[in-house]
Amino acid sequence: MNKTIQLQDLGHKDYKATWDYQEQLFQNVLDIKIQNRREERQDQTPNYFLFVEHPHVYTLGKSGDLSNLLLSEKQLEAKGATFYKINRGGDITYHGPGQIVGYPILDLENFFTDIHKYLRLLEEAIILTLAEYNITGTRSEGETGVWLGVGTPFARKICALGVRASRWVTMHGFALNANADLGYFDNIIPCGIKGKAVTSLNVELGVEKVNEEEVKEKILKHFTQLFDCTVI
């Protein structure tokens, strides 16, 4: 089993170009697995972790409802945003500047074969990261992602999750609002859940801007501990 993960920080990158790159890495891992089974080989499969920040974009999961996007094509254009229907789970979400997006492309057979556990560990990495800023992140029953103030009238989402998996290989991942412009969430019903607010790290801390590189380091630290892996 290969528990080494190749880290790549893609910086500010177009959503479609990043999606294509994810698909390329995802397919590479799948091809090795298929070839191993076909030829009774035991070649190691690679694992990747991509950090990226996207320009303004809305994405809709495969089971999502398009009516949760509250903008017409012209309005999208006026806001300088794009839209894609994609092959992850979940409904609609927003990505943009000031948001930390992580795409782990893992062969879970290197770790454990349990998608539910995988999602919970992604959430846990974010919850532990928030705790370092004295913010209490929690899960909300029946809803993926990381929330604040669950069980109160002020429940709000700070991190969205949506993944795809095939033959235990994962892609897509999480989006943590660090310094995101929350106004862009007004144009959707986030994750298809009505009446729930969104928030960001800088808003919760009452500061103009948080250090995103520092946040990424903390996420990675907790991710490697939870998955018992090494990042190169």
Curated annotation (Swiss-Prot):
One of its GO terms (cellular component) is cytoplasm. Its EC number is 2.3.1.181. It is found in: Cytoplasm. Gene3D superfamilies: Bira Bifunctional Protein, Domain 2 (3.30.930.10). It comes from the Bacteria. One of its GO terms (biological process) is protein modification process. PROSITE patterns: BPL_LPL_CATALYTIC, LIPB. It holds the Pfam family LplA-B_cat. The record marks K157 as: Lowers pKa of active site Cys. Transmembrane segments: none annotated. The keyword Transport does not apply. InterPro entries: aa-tRNA-synth_II/BPL/LPL, BPL_LPL_catalytic, Octanoyltransferase, Octanoyltransferase_CS. Residues 43-231 form the BPL/LPL catalytic domain. CDD domains: LipB. Substrate binds at R88, G89, G90, D91, I92, T93, Y94, H95, A160, L161, G162, G173, F174, A175. Keywords: Acyltransferase, Cytoplasm, Transferase. GO terms for molecular function: lipoyl(octanoyl) transferase activity. The active site is at C191 (acyl-thioester intermediate). Pathway: Protein modification; protein lipoylation via endogenous pathway; protein N(6)-(lipoyl)lysine from octanoyl-[acyl-carrier-protein]: step 1/2. It catalyses: octanoyl-[ACP] + L-lysyl-[protein] = N(6)-octanoyl-L-lysyl-[protein] + holo-[ACP] + H(+). In the reaction, the free carboxyl group of octanoic acid is attached via an amide linkage to the epsilon-amino group of a specific lysine residue of lipoyl domains of lipoate-dependent enzymes. HAMAP family: LipB. Belongs to the LipB family. This is Octanoyltransferase. It comes from Flavobacterium psychrophilum (strain ATCC 49511 / DSM 21280 / CIP 103535 / JIP02/86).
